[in-house]
Amino acid sequence: MKIFVDTANIEEIKKANELGVICGVTTNPSLIAKEGRDFKEVIKEITSIVDGPISGEVISMECEGMVKEAREIAKIHENMVIKIPMCAEGLKAVNILHKEGIKTNVTLIFSAVQALLAARAGASYVSPFLGRLDDIGSTGMTLIEDISEIFAVHGIETEIISASVRNPIHVLECAKAGSDIATIPYNVIMQMIKHPLTDAGIEKFLKDYEGMNK
């Protein structure tokens, strides 16, 4: 399973990239707004840091507007992937963009049939949201398993990006469920690095080494 970082914060992206574990970035209007900077300016800087898929989202809710925005975003860099919301107008836009060779990531997926429709419309990626399903008492991992099974049975090449990932357990379960990618907040990536026994082991090694050199 590949790992993307889910942020628009340049420092977080730089730090995550230095770890050598990420191969893509996802952003959304909320994450961009937090940075208080121009959308294109932020995206251009991200593309200079990470050599991999960079998702930028449209804000229009009608097909014509989505397609227009998508074409402009796609011009920023060859690695751009256009995030399109799951809705009828979004599917129309995805189909048009697919025919033009523009990659898309259909977001806000909450059911396997939504993912199937997005894939058949020509989506390069689908993004099921785990945490938000957990919030309403559903099991996000069942959704990942269902999408993965459907895509495998029917030979669908659309990749699954598990989104709304909130903790290391989510990441573990995504990998086991067959997700192609997990897009993870920077703070969760840092949580994944740590384990109490690892920290204790490092501390013991250092103490033993110091004892040898006294």
Swiss-Prot record:
Q: Which Pfam families match?
A: TAL_FSA
GO BP annotations of the record are:
carbohydrate metabolic process; pentose-phosphate shunt
Which cell locations does it reside in?
A: Cytoplasm
What keywords appear on the UniProt entry? Answer: Cytoplasm, Pentose shunt, Schiff base, Transferase
Task: Specify the signal sequence span.
Answer: none
Recorded metabolic or biological pathway in which this protein acts: Carbohydrate degradation; pentose phosphate pathway; D-glyceraldehyde 3-phosphate and beta-D-fructose 6-phosphate from D-ribose 5-phosphate and D-xylulose 5-phosphate (non-oxidative stage): step 2/3
Give yes or no: UniProt keyword Nucleotide-binding.
Answer: no
Q: Which GO terms describe its cellular component?
A: cytoplasm
Per the record, what are the reactions this protein catalyses?
Answer: D-sedoheptulose 7-phosphate + D-glyceraldehyde 3-phosphate = D-erythrose 4-phosphate + beta-D-fructose 6-phosphate
Top-level taxon of the source organism: Bacteria
Taken from the UniProt record, the cysteine pairs bridged by disulfide bonds within this chain are none
InterPro entries found in the cross-reference section: Aldolase_TIM, TAL/FSA, Transaldolase_3B, Transaldolase_3B/F6P_aldolase, Transaldolase_AS, TSA/FSA_arc/bac
Q: List, from the UniProt record, the residues annotated as the active site of this protein.
A: 83
Q: Name one GO molecular function term.
A: aldehyde-lyase activity
> EC number(s) per UniProt?
2.2.1.2
* Class of enzymatic activity (EC top level): transferase
The protein's matches in Gene3D superfamilies, at most eight in alphabetical order, are given as: Aldolase class I
NCBIfam families reported for this sequence: fsa_talC_mipB
Task: Outline what the protein does.
Answer: Transaldolase is important for the balance of metabolites in the pentose-phosphate pathway.
**Similarity-based family:** Belongs to the transaldolase family. Type 3B subfamily.
Q: What is this protein called?
A: Probable transaldolase
**Species of provenance:** Clostridium botulinum (strain Eklund 17B / Type B)
| Lineage, broadest ranks | Bacteria, Bacillati, Bacillota, Clostridia, Eubacteriales
